[in-house]
Amino acid sequence: MVTLIEHSPVLIIAVPLLLAFLTPLIGMASKKARNAVVIVGLSFVAFLVFALARDVILNGIHTYTLGATSPSLTIPEGTMVPIRIILEVDGVSVFMGIVIAIVALVAVIYSLSSMKGETGQNRFYTLLLLMVAGAFGMVFTGDLFNLFVFLEITSISGAALVAFKTRFADSQEGGFKYIVVSAVASLMVLFAISLLYAQYNLLNIGALAAAMQYTMLDRIALVILIAAFAMKLGGVPMHMWLSDTYSVAPASITVLLITVSQASMYALMRICFILYGVTLDMAVVGWIIIAIGILSMFIGVTMAVRQTDITRLIAYNCVCEAGFMLVGLGVGLTVLGNPTALKTYGTMAISGSIFHMINHALFEGLLFLVAGAIFYRIGTRDLNQMGGLGHTMKFTAAFFLLGALASSGLPPFNGFASKILIYESVYQFNPVLTIIGILVSIITLAVFVKAFFSAFTGAVLPKYEDVKEVPKTMIAAMTIFAVIIIIFGLFPGLIVDWVVRPATNALVDQASYINAIMGAMP
């Protein structure tokens, strides 16, 4: 068991990669065997993630050096800097790993029925596993270049999955937009990395943080990295791709795309807090991120009001919810150099942002799965063409209502638990920001109430009289999200104490992250 945990960082990435190449071979022999192997494999990965999380929370940062005589040996004998590929897993990394593991497993369970009638399922599961491996790599890697590599893996596989249903023109358009935006963001990341590498001859994040001199080129690199990852997570004004992509991808893939966007949010946090940290005055950077967050909240919710396509409505709500996370992150960055303010409300704002990341994945994921279930049964996403579905799709209707209430931040659901942390902390920083957040949540509730009544209430339309509930595996996938939403809403204190606070502490502790690399010399 000890050896398994020691090697778990690389296994968590390697197992999905291996399964991605084995899936087509197994699928040619038996579809059932292929499905079973994928589910068992991702269940094993989830087990490794939770085991690693326990180890990190109890024992601190876990480093894994590929090719070293010992996985914990980060700096080879005879050198003063890390030169190998290093995976560095701390509280915030493993937190994101938990999010990815849960969502990936749910996505596969949902796909068993939702993608059953599609051709090319071997390719579908291969691409899905590649995207999962890339997402894990983004949050576990300890160097910037491999962050770029894993970002590329998620981008290419994600674009192919968005456009997977090639018979639909809008799917192809969505996939094309996703790959174009991803390519631009990736090139920006690569250019920023080249600016840093040219100065310091280093790629490891911890080593770079220790050597950082905050030159003009360093500041330019920071601006480029913020813009690139804000684009990937769908922050305004770089959100133009998100609704066109999320609304046309298979529902299970949209859920995974949310985690990829959150991996970009993680990268933004890692760069701001660890790579640059307190030495650089982050007040201006924090306010820029707050501004992006407020714009995302406002534009996201106002665009959602206008939508009649249920998936586009949820997609714009994703833009809005990303705004809440960005505001919490921005407040934390703004007071990073002020120990008193950081302790009073800064860490609470960061905790709210981090907690909202997993909550966002859960309730938005549930809403997209519900939208996928509706499309699976009636073949349309147009709310004006729906009505009375709650009579024949009772579970689906209940799941939509649950996700909508959670997204609106109402108790006793998980969205309330994370938003209240953001509201309370941000109020101490600037009350106006909290008022804006509350107003946005009220409008969000109104949007979802309207959508719920349009789709599920009223008399059953004649053309939908024979509509039945979706298959059991799709119900099971939605149930997993629903149960976690309720648990997180009823026991938020436990979740904050067990995983959110360790993630927050790791994010603001630049010295420990650096020492985990630079202190492990032979």
Question: For the regions a protein language model found, what residue spans apply to each?
Answer:
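Membrane-interface alpha-helices at helix entry/exit sites of multi-pass transporters
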Residues: R34-A36, G174-K177, A249-T259, R381-A397, ...
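Transmembrane helix-loop-helix hairpins at membrane boundaries of multipass inner-membrane proteins
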Residues: M1-L11, F21-T126, R501-Q510, M518
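Structural signature of hydrophobic alpha-helical transmembrane segments
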Residues: L4-V15, G91-I102, L144-S157, M216-M231, ...
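Alpha-helical transmembrane segments and their helix-start/interface "positive-inside/aromatic belt" motifs
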Residues: K31-L42, E173-A183, T311, A315, ...
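Alpha-helical multi-pass transmembrane bundles of energy-transducing inner-membrane proteins
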Residues: A29, R123-L130, G134-I220, M231, ...
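Hydrophobic alpha-helical transmembrane segments of multi-pass membrane proteins
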Residues: M96-V99, V180, V223-A230, L256-L257, ...
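Juxtamembrane/interfacial segments at transmembrane-helix boundaries in multi-pass membrane proteins
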Residues: V56-R84, L187-D244, A267-I288, M325, ...
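Predominantly late transmembrane helices and immediately cytosolic-facing juxtamembrane segments
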Residues: V236, E364-F368, V432-V467
